[in-house]
Swiss-Prot record:
The keyword Signal applies. Venom dipeptidyl-peptidase which removes N-terminal dipeptides sequentially from polypeptides having unsubstituted N-termini provided that the penultimate residue is proline. May process venom proteins into their active forms and/or modulate the chemotactic activity of immune cells after the insect sting. It catalyses: Release of an N-terminal dipeptide, Xaa-Yaa-|-Zaa-, from a polypeptide, preferentially when Yaa is Pro, provided Zaa is neither Pro nor hydroxyproline. Expressed by the venom gland. It is found in: Secreted. It comes from Vespula vulgaris (Yellow jacket). This is Venom dipeptidyl peptidase 4. Belongs to the peptidase S9B family. DPPIV subfamily. Keywords: Allergen, Aminopeptidase, Disulfide bond, Glycoprotein, Hydrolase, Protease, Secreted, Signal.
Length: 776
């Protein structure tokens, strides 16, 4: 389950791998301006509020980095205006044309990727959406040298196509089987079939099934090349014993082809039911027989009902795999050699919650992972960069390289030549921040914040950053997402800015003509914990007036609503156009605040995080007379929809007058096994059945009586099934509790196809609840 923002935009991901080419067709100078364009006197501009339609489209969405490092000094990217593929030289600071967009004119292109040697262009077209990350496309290969096209996979829809590193060889997956396509100097050579047991919707090779795609890999790929491209590790998922979810697809109104609804069946493991059986295989791509070796899971450590969490290559000869037990509180990290033998292991256990082991890094005989470590504070443990000696004795020594009450969110890279680790972490006491830090790999110095010295074009300190490093770490792209609109710069490893990639000047000019909400951050102590609160106030806020307040909730475990990335979604419309205070509250269970707060939600979803939303809102009403306690509402999507329904059910003192739950979980017995069991365990009397019953909204509908409640769901939701809302609706109807319900026919979890209707529907609901004039 992944949090949804207030608006969603589908962008094609152009994953471009290209070695430097010597043939230059033309040279293009990128605009390297740092300027902020001012329109005469910005202070005297006539400003207007945001329109609702602007907040769920891309009107105020910032451009970020649209390239891929292909060497330590070159980036390949797509020109947003022309569609041409260009290569940018960081040292020369100029771009050269690699492929003209006209080569794709014959296709409705969704994706294109250059081969590592730069001779071939893989073009994906005729896209069909899969699940959250997966797509199916037809593919054609364009030979740049001979200007010829070659269709692959018999022009069938292919689930995945990927170039091997360093070569012009290709892996593609058709009907859940893996194919290896070789190329030689003379062009296309031959295709070898790697697997033969794939069954559509049942047995998957090289691509994940639904639950692994959504909850574990968060990707459409389950193949991992060795650094030289000679070997391939691939995962297989056997869903034969996994039960199916079934829903109906109703089709286009009035279309004779849709006279009868179509059944949609998906293998979907719910809590306590059988999971897919996962296996991992290693294949030598340069062996004519494609010899395969099983990389067996360490059953002694993680049991037979285990999960495959991460696969990576340490070097040419070793695969490092992270396995977990089913409830994800025991992890075994295993080093395999090319014979499938276990060389070494690292065992990690979490006794008070769940594990969140991510990518590993290696440097001079040590391995570096992100692991919970004591902070020396009452907040408990935080995820830190932890170094292990790779010899791994019985009790391997570990060293915390980032001690303090800050949360390391991601390790970016290790600069092998200088022995420095780069990572992203929150600020001290600032869970909403994400900054780029570095620390020596030997721990000889304290960490240094790199992005804390970077200023936005408006002159503010960057407080929310991402970084993309070149292969050897000599340069990096820094994307500053906040507090101001995003801007993108290239730095060298001495942290000197060498180039401005994107300043979003047009977005900044548009924002100069819009009213923006005032932002108020505060800490509120509730239920023995400090909750973070962010209030968005109307631009013309007057303390002597009384305003309605709308709380937008998610509250899922290990998530945040309050981050310092700039966004211009629903909150800017409600504040500037409707004069409604908009609130985010991060209470117990939220991330970046230490293990005590994080794990307080463990095995009891729908309890403490919901109580904090209610208690903090009540305290805000008592603290500030300008918050109208008679006009306070709440809404959320997905887990936030669950939180909304549970808030209304538990709010016996009527802190909230109304709420909207979009695509909510109503009972965790209906949700998928991997996500739910991570936080709740099993729904059995021996384990945590009482916890599941306690968090079932349908058992609490009587306490929703007297509040305005709207329930919204798409009937084609493959993630949080329509069954969830129907179960809640049935309970409300049986109890004779009045509510409103909107069903979006055939729409999936994100409701992409009906966003205008969705937001106009919500706007009318808030107008009624808050006694506002109807805007639409």
């Amino acid at each position: 389950m992944v949090p949804l923002r207030s608006f969603v935009l589908l962008n094609s991901l152009f994953l471009v791998l290209l070695a430097a080419r010597t043939v230059v067709t033309r040279v293009i100078d990128k605009d390297n301006s740092d300027r902020i364009v001012k329109t005469q006197n910005d202070q005297n501009l006539s400003k207007v509020p945001f329109n609702l339609e602007e907040t769920y489209t891309a009107d105020f969405l910032a451009y970020v980095f649209n390239g891929t490092w292909t060497s330590d000094t070159t980036i390949v990217y797509t020109d947003r205006r022309t569609g041409d593929i260009l290569q940018f030289d960081v040292i020369k600071q100029r771009s050269t044309l690699i492929v003209d967009s006209s080569v794709m004119d014959a296709y409705i292109v969704s994706n294109y990727v250059l081969s590592p040697k730069g001779r071939y262009l893989l073009i994906g077209y005729d896209l069909k959406k899969g699940y959250r990350y997966s797509t199916f496309m037809r593919y054609v290969i364009y030979d740049i040298e001979h200007r010829a096209y070659h269709k692959i996979g018999n022009d069938m829809h292919i689930a995945l196509a990927k170039w091997a590193p360093l070569t012009d060889d290709l892996i593609y997956i058709l009907d859940n089987d893996i194919y290896y396509m070789r190329f030689s100097n003379n062009g296309f050579n031959d295709v070898q079939r790697v697997t033969y047991d794939g069954i559509s919707g049942i047995v998957y090779n090289g691509v994940p099934d639904w639950v692994y795609e959504e909850e574990v890999l968060q990707d459409s790929s389950a193949i991992w090349f060795s650094p030289d491209g000679n070997h391939l590790a691939y995962a297989s998922f056997d869903d034969r014993n996994v039960q199916e979810i079934l829903y109906l697809h109703y089709g286009e109104p009035g279309n004779l082809d849709d006279q009868y609804p179509t059944e949609v069946k998906i293998k979907y493991p719910k809590v306590g039911t059988l999971n897919p059986v996962v296996s991992l295989t290693l294949v030598d791509l340069h062996d004519p027989t494609l010899n395969k070796i099983d990389l067996k899971a360490p059953h002694y450590a993680v049991g037979t009902d285990n999960l495959l969490y991460n696969v990576q290559w340490k070097d040419f000869d070793h695969v490092v795999v992270t396995w977990s037990n089913r409830v994800q509180n025991k992890t075994e990290i295993v080093w395999y050699n090319m014979y499938g033998e276990i060389v070494k292991t690292l065992h990690v256990v979490e006794h008070k919650g769940w594990l969140d082991i991510k990518h590993l890094f290696f440097y001079k005989g040590s391995v570096y992972i992100r692991k919970l470590q004591p902070s020396g504070t009452k907040a408990g443990r935080f995820h830190h960069v932890t170094r292990y000696d790779e010899t791994f004795k019985q009790s391997p020594t570990q060293m915390d390289l980032t001690p303090d009450a800050i949360e390391v969110q991601n390790i970016c890279t290790i600069d092998q030549s200088n022995g420095r680790i780069y990572y992203l972490a929150s600020g001290l006491g600032k869970p909403s921040q994400k900054n780029l830090y570095s620390v020596p790999a030997d721990g000889s110095e304290k960490p240094t914040c790199i992005s804390c010295n970077v200023l936005t074009p408006e002159g503010n300190v960057c407080t929310y950053a991402d970084a993309i490093f070149s292969p050897l770490g000599q340069y990096y792209v820094l994307v500053c997402h906040g507090p101001d609109p995003a801007f993108v710069s290239i730095f060298n490893n001495a942290h000197q800015k060498v180039y401005s990639w994107e300043n979003n000047l047009s977005l900044r000019k548009k924002l100069a003509k819009r009213h923006l909400p005032l932002v108020k951050d505060l800490d509120v102590r509730a239920n023995g914990y400090e909750s973070k609160v962010r209030l968005f106030l109307p631009h013309n806020f007057d303390e002597s007036k009384s305003y309605p307040m709308l709380v937008n909730v998610y509250a899922g475990p290990n998530t945040l609503k309050i981050i310092d990335a700039a966004s211009y979604g629903h909150q800017v419309y409600m504040t500037t156009n409707r004069s409604v205070i908009y609130a985010y509250i991060d209470g117990r269970g939220s991330s970046n605040k230490g293990s005590k707060m994080l794990f307080s939600i463990y095995r009891k979803l729908g309890t403490v995080e919901v109580e904090d939303q209610i208690t903090v809102t009540r305290q805000l009403q008592e603290m500030f007379p300008w918050i109208d306690s008679k006009r306070t509402g709440v809404w959320g999507w997905s887990y936030g929809g669950f939180s909304t329904a549970m808030i209304l059910a538990k709010d016996t003192s009527f802190v909230f007058k109304c709420g909207i739950a979009i695509a909510p979980v109503s009972s965790w017995i209906y949700y998928d096994s991997i996500y739910t069991e991570r936080f709740m365990g099993f729904p059995t009397p021996e384990d945590n059945l009482s916890g599941y019953n306690e968090t079932d909204v349908s058992r609490r509908v009587e306490d929703i009586r007297g509040k305005k409640f709207m329930l919204i769901h798409g009937s084609g939701d493959d993630n949080v099934h329509y069954q969830q809302s129907l179960a809640l609706a049935k309970a409300l109807e049986k109890a004779d509790v009045m509510f409103e319900q909107i069903t979006y026919t055939d729409e999936a979890h994100a409701l992409f196809g009906v966003l205008p209707h969705l937001y106009h529907t919500m706007d009318r609901f808030w107008s009624d609840c808050f006694s506002l004039s109807h805007a639409h």
